[in-house]
Amino acid sequence: QKKDKKDKFYGLF
């Protein structure tokens, strides 16, 4: 489970 980009993208929301 490695959500690097997702974490950043979701972080904006």
Swiss-Prot record:
Q: Principal localization?
A: secreted
Q: Tell me the domain of life.
A: Eukaryota
**Is Secreted set as a keyword in this record?**
yes
Residue numbers bearing the Pyrrolidone carboxylic acid modification: 1
- Keywords of this entry: Amidation, Pyrrolidone carboxylic acid, Secreted
| Modified-residue entries (Phenylalanine amide), positions | 13
Q: What does UniProt give as GO cellular component?
A: extracellular region
Segments passing through the bilayer: none
Q: Where in the cell is it found?
A: Secreted
Q: What tissues harbor this protein? A: Expressed by the venom gland.
Instruction: Give the family from UniProt.
Output: Belongs to the tachykinin family.
Name by which UniProt lists this protein: Tachykinin-like peptide-XII
Lineage, opening ranks: Eukaryota, Metazoa, Ecdysozoa, Arthropoda, Chelicerata
